[in-house]
Amino acid sequence: MIQRGFTMQERREKQGNNSPYLLTPYEMANLVFKTGAISFTVSAGTQPFQYLLNKLQFSQSGTPSGLSGGLFRGMYRGFLPYAIAGQKRGAVAVTHKQTNKVTEEEEFEAPFRQRWWGTIFFSQADLLVSNGLSGKARLQNVGVINAENFKWSLSNFWKLTSVNWGSRSFAGGVNFALIGFAGDYVSSFYKFDKDLYNKILGGATSGVIATLFTTAPNAYADSKLLQTKVAENNRLITVSPYTMFGQMKSHVKAVGLKEAFMTFFKVSYLQQVAVRAPQAAITFALIFGMDEYMGPQPLKKVWPGRVEELESENPSPSPTKK
C-alpha cells in the first residue's frame, strides 16, 4: 500500500499537480468518442430486449398494445429517442466509471461514504438527462404515442421524467454502484490472462446481480409508465402512486395475499428476470469490455504526436526535487 502511494505521488508530480478531474481538449475528445461508441452499441444491442419486455408486460396486464407492423419495424420503433437517451446515460455512466477510476489511482482509497455519494449523484443525473427520452421511446415502441398525438412540451417532459422517478432512483443506485466500483471488484474474481476477458465477464456478472435487485422496482416503474394516456390536447396523463397502490390492494383482496405474491414471483418477477438479466449482462459487459478495450485514448491513432506533446509539456522532475 505504501509503495502504491509512492507511485501515485510520482504520477502527480509528473502531471504538474494538476487536478485529475480537469480534462484537456484531447482527454475530453477521447471521453466523448468513447461515450458515443459505447452508448450506441449498448442501445442497438439492448433494444430487442426492450421490445420483449414491452410484449411481456402487456401480455401480463391483458392490455392490447401497438406492438405490430413487422418484427424488425416493431422492435426498433422508438429507437431514436432510446438511442439519444442512451447517449446521455452513457455519458453519465462512463464519466462515473472514469471518475471512480481516477479516484482510485490518485487517492487509492477514497472514503466509502464519498463513493456512495458519487453513486447517488450520478444515478440522479442519469434520470434527469435520460428518463424522459427513455419513457418516450417506450411509449412510442408500444404505440401509445406517435408523431400525430405527441408533442414535446415542458408539461410532457416533466410527466415522462417524474412518472417513475422514485422506483428508478433505487434501481439506478444499484446499477451505478456496480458500474462505478463494485463491478471491478467482481471482475477481480476472474483470472484470465487477458484482463479484457475478466472485465467482460465481470461486467456480465454484475449485470445479472443488478437484475436480481432491480427487477421489482423496474417492473413497477414500467407498469406505471405504460398506463400513461394521451389527452385530446396532446398532454400526457400519468397514473399516481396512490392509483397504483389501489390497483395492487384490489388485486390482493380479490385473490388473497399468498396467491398475489406467488403470482407476482412466478409470473411477473421470474419472467422479467429472464429478459432483464441478459439485457443487463450485455449492457454491463459492453460498458466494461469496451472501456477496457478502447482504453483512455481511443483516438491516439488518429491524433498523432500527442504522446510527444505531453512529454514536452510535462518534463521529468529534477532528481533533487523533494
Swiss-Prot record:
The keyword Flavoprotein does not apply. One of its GO terms (cellular component) is host cell mitochondrial membrane. It comes from the Bacteria. GO terms for biological process: proteolysis. The active site is at S68. Its EC number is 3.4.22.-. Transmembrane segments: none annotated. It is an enzyme of class 3 (hydrolase). Its main location: secreted. Changing S134A: Does not affect ability to catalyze degradation of host STX17. InterPro entries: Serine_protease (IPR041000). The keyword Membrane applies. Keywords: Host membrane, Host mitochondrion, Hydrolase, Membrane, Protease, Secreted, Serine protease, Virulence. One of its GO terms (molecular function) is serine-type peptidase activity. It is found in: Secreted; Host mitochondrion membrane. Serine protease effector that inhibits host cell autophagy by targeting SNX17. Localizes to the host endoplasmic reticulum-mitochondria contact site and catalyzes degradation of host SNX17, thereby impairing endoplasmic reticulum-mitochondria communication, leading to inhibit autophagy as well as staurosporine-induced apoptosis. This is Serine protease Lpg1137. The lineage of its organism: Bacteria, Pseudomonadati, Pseudomonadota, Gammaproteobacteria, Legionellales.
